[in-house]
Regions:
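Sec-dependent bacterial lipoprotein signal peptides
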Residues: 1-20
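Secondary-structure transition/hinge residues
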Residues: 1, 43-46, 101
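Short solvent-exposed beta->alpha transition segments
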Residues: 32-33, 47-92
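Glycine-centered loop/turn positions within well-structured domains
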Residues: 16, 48, 123
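Short, low-complexity N-terminal intrinsically disordered segments enriched in polar/charged residues
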Residues: 17-44
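Exposed beta-sheet edge and beta->alpha loop/turn motif
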Residues: 86-135
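Structured segments of extracytoplasmic/periplasmic soluble domains
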Residues: 37-45, 53-57, 119
Length: 135
């Protein structure tokens, strides 16, 4: 009888582990979608939209003035590295952006180090780092 119970306990633990893997996979798929939407917002100059991916402790915090970014044109981006934490709740992503400013058409490259965290309660990813500093 003890062996019989032990088999069911092991089976239940395996099933719970598999369910956890599915949850992790689902969260990482959400991250890919979120990251791509964020990168596309930057690519098309939608800086207010990109800022909406940031976690703000207080929704009444002052939103930055994006006026200085209106002449920035991102020509391309390339994800260089993605580092996923062991618990799959934090992702560090390193992205190269090529861009220029309308007043000076010299193409520049900036490396952006992004930190993302998953909010289990809201079931979404938040950008914890700042937007790229396009000089």
């Amino acid at each position: 009888m003890l062996k019989f119970m032990a088999k069911y306990v092991v089976l239940a633990l395996l099933l719970m582990g598999c369910a956890g893997l599915d949850m992790g996979k689902e969260n990482l798929e959400k991250f890919e979608d979120t990251s791509e939407a964020y990168l596309m917002a930057l690519r098309w100059g939608e800086y207010e939209t990109a800022y909406g991916f940031k976690r703000r402790p207080n929704s009444y915090d002052e939103i930055p003035d994006f006026h200085d970014l209106r002449d920035v044109r991102v020509t391309s981006h390339r994800i260089k590295q993605t580092i996923i934490s062991e618990d799959e709740m934090t992702v560090m992503q390193i992205v190269d952006f090529q861009y220029y400013r309308m007043r000076n058409v010299t193409v520049k490259t900036i490396t952006d180090r992004q930190k993302w965290e998953y909010d289990q309660e809201k079931k979404r990813w938040y950008l914890m780092s700042d937007l790229p500093n396009f000089e």
